[in-house]
Amino acid sequence: WGASLRTAAWACAHRVDSYRFTADREALKKSLPILESNARFIMSWFEDDGEGRYLSGPGVSPETGFYAPDGTGPNVLSYVSNGASHDQLLGRESLRNYIYACGELGVQTPTLLKAVQFLRKIPQPAIGPDGRVQEWKQTFEEMQKGHRHISHLYGLFPGTEWDILNTPEYAEAVRKSADFRRKYADMGNNGIRTGWSTAWLINLYAALGDGNAAEDRMYTMLRHYINSNLFDIHPPFQIDGNFGFSSGVAECLIQSRIMQDGFQVILLAPALADGWKKGSATGLRTRGGLKVDLSWQNGRVQATATATRPGKFRFMHQGRKKDLSMNKGAPARREFPP
């Protein structure tokens, strides 16, 4: 972690995501100096690679390494490189979030103008020859095939760079990457032996719409990484595993991470496991300011959504969609199939 300088960027992302739920302009206004400082740091750290692209470096993919040739041999264990996918994703997100915040607040600054230009030159992570998201700019072999850190998949969750609707090619690459990690972790390849990492996989599979895989990781977590008092273990207690598990369950029931055609997309019951034939949840909150009560039974989904502020929403379930413009306090009831 000593060479991972994007932790502040991750913290800044929470400030902007909170605004997407609450629309608290005063909180966003207070956060703007922090978001601007982070954006300026990103632009000072990333450097031109000689081909007009900006890469972060030196940096790491947290806590894991790769085998690469150097002057001493063909396969030397290394950690530091330029353009690690985790850094690239957080750099892009930092600038996008700063630009978004300025737009919401009606602010124009020299930093904003520079960020707009700079963002265009930060490349996405590559998809490797095997179809997985590359963890580093080059196609290196990872140190541990089942490693607990899956930082290069940040773009799907908790980030919003990728999703199943707008970037299906990256969603599929994330699926292959997650399946690869899960396979080798289950084989005992120095793998995912922590609750928080298992919880991250739950959320990734939920974002991919794979309820069965998400449920599989839930049971793995309950069997191996939850104490009798329900504390998540690393083996020491780590509350991010508990929060991550709860988040994963919620993401299986409702998601609001995607924008499409100017609509806030609300995915209803996007990742129900086959065994979840019947159920309900109340008081679910979404980006865009909805409060949703949800129930499902044998493939039919019913939702009642109440807006806390005006907005445009696209309700979706299994490919079907309904667009609505909603006013504050006005409940809307939707059922799929209609």
Regions found by a protein language model. Give the residues of each.
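A glycine-rich phosphate-binding loop feature that marks nucleotide/adenosyl-phosphate handling sites
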Residues: G59-V60, A115-R120, A269-W276
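Intrinsically disordered, low-complexity coil segments
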Residues: G65-S81, R182-I192, R257-K277
